[in-house]
Amino acid sequence: MTTTADNATPTVTGPTVRRTAWIAVALAVFASAWGGNEFTPLLVMYRETGNFGAVAVDALLFLYVVGIVPSLLISGPLSDRYGRRPLMLPAPVFAAVGSLLLALGANSIVLLSIGRVFSGIALGLSMAVGGSWITELSVRGGAGAASGARRAAMSLTAGFGIGAGVAGALAQWAPWPHVLAYVVNISLAAIALVLLLVRAPETRSPSGTPGRLVDDLKIPSAAHRRFLFVVLPVAPWVFGACASAYAIIPALMSARTAGAPIAFAALCCVLGLAAGFGIQSLGRRIDNPDGVRGVAAALTVLAIGMALAALAAHMLTIWMSLIAATVLGCGYGMAMIAGLLEVQRIAARSGRNDLAGLTAVFYSVTYLGFAIPAVLALITEFWHAVTYTHMFIFGIVAALLCLAIALYGHRRHAVAA
């Protein structure tokens, strides 16, 4: 996640706080995002030096979704009941434990799997609780809610990008490639935990007479026809594009980047994330509140990205691979902002006051895209005649099919419906 579409100013009551109080929470979010994405450029390393098959390694990329989705869906309502601190304090702990298990598990699929799940839990807590806490602290510190939202988004984005870049560089050129990158994250998480304990005041008092938790978890707007036919077709492409850009393409190019395959994977990751973040301001301008232009533009860019990825898989040249990763990153950013803006409008106009829950559902579906590398690796393992070029061509067709569904959904189910 690199952005938020919630531009509404929340009502945040309570005493004022230091203007810099939000930084402690932002560092915890940064450390969790770092821990979530540090593993990605190292996939090439585990393929080359570990005793794991391609399917197993790509499945590890997806496994942290097992931690993200439950914590994302549940921790938000829990933090509304019990406060932000009790739910956010464990995030850097989970991040550190996850990195520790990854550092110890270079040759153990079990330790790597558990470590990825712990990293996912930390990221889910940070996305659901950390973002709200940063916004509330920003408002109490004298900044606007929009500033708080930007700070939360930047904390996540910086963690994702810098974490991948530093981890890739350390694994490529520093000693102890299976350990050192994770030690950096453990240190960051420890510092973040201390700062949370001493410098981050609570902004949400525990609810005195809470209702049933199951009622808080209900999200009526998730059944809205526009959400089903316009938002869901684009959602898995968000991180499906990312996974293609910095998991599949670097793996295909590993033989052509023998001098620095891990650094090349990190470069693809950073390029994709940077392009995705940079394109989002354009995505806001393209989007129209009463239309479907943002989603249509995103799926069009994604189809182009799939075409370039097919060319990269066929040509196996570094320059085409980097271009494909960058365009796929643009598709990721466009799909993210278009989906979030649609979610905001659906929740606002439905009158059900479930924006946070609907946003969590959207993010949960976006993370399913990380399953794509494992699925494609499984296909190539069982059907050797099917190449990645063929599958990326199928991706073009799939993106255009999703575009057709979204256009149909827009015509049949207007935003205000």
For the regions a language model picked out, list residue spans one by one.
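Symmetry-related core transmembrane helices of the 12-TM Major Facilitator Superfamily/SLC fold
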Residues: 179-197, 390-409
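Cytoplasmic helix-loop-helix junction between adjacent transmembrane helices
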Residues: 115-156
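Central cavity-lining transmembrane alpha-helices of secondary-active solute carriers
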Residues: 59-76, 127-131, 270-282
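C-terminal transmembrane helical hairpin of 12-TM major facilitator-type secondary transporters
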Residues: 291-337
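A late C-terminal transmembrane helix in Major Facilitator Superfamily
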Residues: 327, 332, 338-388, 394-398
